[in-house]
From Swiss-Prot:
Protein name: Apyrase
Protein encoded by which gene: APY
Role description: Facilitates hematophagy by inhibiting ADP-dependent platelet aggregation in the host. Cleaves adenosine triphosphate (ATP) and adenosine diphosphate (ADP) to adenosine monophosphate (AMP) and inorganic phosphate in calcium-dependent manner. Triggers proliferation of host peripheral blood mononuclear cells (PBMCs) and IFN-gamma/IFNG production.
Tissue specificity comment: Salivary gland (at protein level).
Record's keyword terms, sorted: ATP-binding, Calcium, Glycoprotein, Hemostasis impairing toxin, Hydrolase, Immunity, Metal-binding, Nucleotide-binding, Platelet aggregation inhibiting toxin, Secreted, Signal, Toxin
């Protein structure tokens, strides 16, 4: 009987290890984060190369306690694709159709990141309604059904010429063949502001996911204010809210996160639902960019706003995308 129990237990452990996204032994989650280095992405060798960095880590769950262990190695990735001398400013990480993608918020290019660290351009997203000459400022991405959805900050502003710029109110729907459709999301973004009772203010979005299990949208805003958007003050504020919206945005809830932020200017840049949590537990990155200084924090919260792991700083650079991986063994190892 004891032998039979051991065999069954061993089989269960194997099944956990082989399940995509499942933690080893139910306690360790592998993840990777990707950097937006801004102007530091430009190669100092002046060889038309642009660089980002991927780092990997482990989220360790013991009972109802969580901790994070980051690995020291920097996985450098390069591209020659750029827009006006800027490139590889990568803002999100997403698995779609069993492939890993990342998004350049300067060129609008959606890259596939291969396991050998090659960045392969897949599609280029034109700004706004898709009939623009510049690239889409991609800041968030998720999957819904068979499609990939890519969005921007969700704010409009008056440019230097006095013209209203609403390009960031559009989102992109991409199918598995790379066909892109531009969708006007002004109404959806306005409904979120109304639900937060700041109809005349602004909400800066960088962390959005569709929950297939709950059939709802989940937003962790990076910045929010009851005042209109102002470039002079936006660096000084973050946002400590969770927004949950029904599929058609007819029902929207704004939830206050109960823990205090290390820095009030830090805001959410990316998150993923933890496997086997019924989309109730979120592993999230927060970033800060203020006075030419940057930092990245990581935290675990639940969908009710309860903090399960307080924020901890994991890097002095700005990492704006996170993804959960089955394994990081051999991840981004260049072939010799």
């Amino acid at each position: 009987m004891f032998l039979k129990f051991c065999i069954v237990a061993f089989a269960i452990c194997l099944s956990i290890n082989l399940s995509e996204g499942a933690p080893r032994s139910g306690t360790i989650y592998n993840f990777a984060i990707i950097a937006d280095l801004d102007k530091k992405s430009i190669s100092p060798k002046n060889d038309n190369n642009y660089k980002s960095i991927v780092k990997v880590g482990e989220l360790i769950e013991v009972g109802d306690k969580y901790s994070v262990k980051m690995k020291k190695e920097d996985h450098e990735i390069f591209t020659k694709y750029a827009y006006k001398g800027r490139g590889a400013e990568l803002s999100e990480f997403l698995i779609y159709k069993w492939k890993l993608y990342t998004f350049d918020d300067k060129s609008g290019i959606v890259f596939r990141l291969k396991t050998n660290a090659d960045l392969i351009p897949w599609v280029t997203l034109a700004n706004g309604n898709g009939d623009q000459t510049d690239g889409f400022k991609a800041e968030w991405a998720t999957t819904k059904g068979d499609k990939m959805y890519v969005g921007s900050t969700g704010i409009s502003f008056t440019d230097k010429t006095g013209k209203l710029n609403s390009n960031s109110l559009w989102i992109k729907e991409i199918d598995q063949d790379g066909k892109v459709q531009s969708l006007d999301w002004k109404e959806q973004y306005d409904k979120i502001k109304s639900a937060m009772k700041i109809p005349n203010g602004f909400i800066w979005h960088e962390a959005v996911n569709w929950s297939k299990l709950k059939n709802q949208w989940v937003f962790l805003p990076r910045k929010c204010s009851e005042r209109p958007f102002d470039t002079k003050t936006e660096e000084t504020i973050g946002c400590n809210k969770i927004i949950i919206a029904s599929e058609n945005f007819e029902i929207i809830k704004s939830i206050q996160i109960k823990g205090k932020s290390i820095n009030r200017a830090a805001g959410f840049s990316s998150f993923k639902f933890l496997p086997d949590s019924d989309d109730q537990i979120l592993l999230a990155l927060k970033t800060i960019e203020k006075d030419d200084k940057t930092a990245t924090y990581i935290t675990v919260i639940d969908i009710t706003g309860r903090v399960l792991m307080p924020e901890m700083q994991i890097n002095s650079d700005k990492y704006e995308g996170i993804v959960l991986l089955k394994s990081t063994e051999g991840f981004l190892k260049r072939s010799q």
